[in-house]
Amino acid sequence: MKKIAIIGKPNVGKSSLFNRILKQRDAIVSETEGTTRDVKRRIVQIGEKEAEILDTGGIEDRNELFEKVKQKSLEAAKDADIILYMVDGKKLPDEEDKQIFRSLQKLGKKIALVINKIDNDKEEENVWNFYEFGTQDIFPISVSHNRKVKRLLDWVEKQLPKKETIKIEIDEELDFDELLAINEGEKKQEESNEINVAILGRVNVGKSSLLNALLKEERSIVSDVAGTTIDTIDESTIYNDKVITFIDTAGIRRRGKIVGIEKYALNRTQKMLERADVALLVLDASEGITEQDERIAGYIDKYKLACIIVLNKWDIAKKSYEEAVKEVRDRFKFLSFAPIITLSAKTRKRVDRLYDLILKVYKNYSTWLPTGQLNRVIKEAQIRHQIPSYKGKPVKILYATQYDTKPPKIALVMNRPEGLHFSYKRYLANVLRENFDLEGTPIILRPRKRGERDEEMEEESY
C-alpha cells in the first residue's frame, strides 16, 4: 500500500488536512505550535483507491524535543511514496522552506507543494511567489474552508496504483445454508484476529518507551519532558497470526492540572478506550502508587477491559517483588483478576513476554463458557453456600447462561433477582475463576427474571 506523508513547519495546517482527508477529527488541532509530536498513521480511501496517510510533526529546530519531532518527520518522508509539503499561504515563502522542499525533491518521490490558508481569490494572487520552489505541482487550498482540497486529492489519486480486484470462486454445489455458514465462520475469524491494546498510565511512567520496545523501533517520541504524548498513537504488529494494535494514550494528569489541548487529548483517550480490548496499566516501579494511578485504573473498570498491570522501570525499583505486588493488590482490589508483570522498557528486559500474556488475557476476555459446565459450577456453588433469604423468602438461581463476550457476560436467571446480594455475586465470580481460566478479564454477572432482556439490566463486573 502506498504511503502519503504530510510534511511542513509547525502550524501550517497539516493535522487539519489529515482530518479533512479522514473526514473526521482524528488528529488534535490547535493554534499552539507543535501540537502533533508523533507520526499518526491511518488507512484512507481517496477516490476509488486506498493509501496510508502519515501526519507528521512540524519541522523546526527549537529544542531537543522538536529536534526529535523533525527527525521523525523526515524519516516519514523517506518512507513515503508521495509527499505533500505544506506552507502557510498568508506568509511569504522563506529560505528554510525552500531548502527543506529541495532536499525532499532529492528523494525522488512524487511531491506537491500545498499552500494552505488561501481563503479567497484575492489571496490566491500571492501564489506566484511560491513558484520559486521549482515545481509545477502547486496546490493553493484552504483546509478550514474546504477550498480546492478536492483538486489536491484528485492529483493524489492519480499518483496511486489501481486497486487490485480479487476473484473468488464459488462452488456451485454449495447451497444457501452452506454459503451462509462459510460467511459466518469467516466473520468470526475476522473478528477474533484483531486485538486493540491501550497503553494507559499517568504522565512520564514510560508508556511511549514501552510502545517503542514492543515494536523494537522508535515509533513514539520519548523525552524527559513530562507529557510528550498528547495524542493517541496507533501502531499495529502481527504476532502469532494476530494483528495487535497498540494505542499509546496521552498521559493523564491530575484533573486540576489538565488545561487546553491536554483536556481534549484526555477526552480522546477516553474515546479510544471504547474500542480497546486489553489495557496495559503502566506503573512506575521506582515510585510508589499514587491516587492518580488509582484514578486511571478506574477507567479500566469503567470500560470493562481486560487488563495487565505493568510495573515498568523495574531495573531501578526500590521495593522487592513481594512488596511491590502486595502494594498493587492492596491499592487495586477491583483489578484483582489482572496479572502483574515486571519489566524495563528502557533496557527491553522481559518486554517480549507481554505478547503471550496479551494473547492469553484476550482469549479469556472473548471466551464462551460451556453452558452445561457453567450450570454445574453454579449449582455446586449454591450447594456449598446457600443464597441468603430475601425478606423471609428463599432466593434461587434457576440456571445461568452466557449471552456475550468481551468481557464474559453471564445472566443468572432467578426467582428473586433483587434478593442477590453483591457479596454473593463476588463469591460466584471467585468460584467461576476457580473453575475456568479467566485470568486478566472481568466477569459481568446479571441477575434477572425469566423473560427479562439482558440489555435492560445494569452492568457490574467482578
From Swiss-Prot:
The record's Gene Ontology biological-process terms are: ribosome biogenesis
User: What family does this belong to?
Assistant: Belongs to the TRAFAC class TrmE-Era-EngA-EngB-Septin-like GTPase superfamily. EngA (Der) GTPase family.
Q: What is this protein called?
A: GTPase Der
Self-association and partners: Associates with the 50S ribosomal subunit.
Domain (KH-like): residue spans on this chain: 367-451
Which residues does the record give as GTP 1 binding sites?
8-15, 55-59, 116-119
Domain (EngA-type G): give its ranges.
2-164, 195-366
Tell me where on the tree of life, at the top rank, the source sits: Bacteria
Purpose of the protein: GTPase that plays an essential role in the late steps of ribosome biogenesis.
What NCBIfam families does its record include?
GTPase_EngA, small_GTP
Record has Nucleotide-binding as a keyword: yes
Organism of provenance: Nitratiruptor sp. (strain SB155-2)
Residues engaged in binding GTP 2: 201-208, 248-252, 312-315
Keyword tags: GTP-binding, Nucleotide-binding, Repeat, Ribosome biogenesis
Q: Does the keyword Phosphoprotein apply?
A: no
Signal peptide residues are none
Q: List GO molecular-function terms, semicolon-separated.
A: GTP binding; ribosome binding
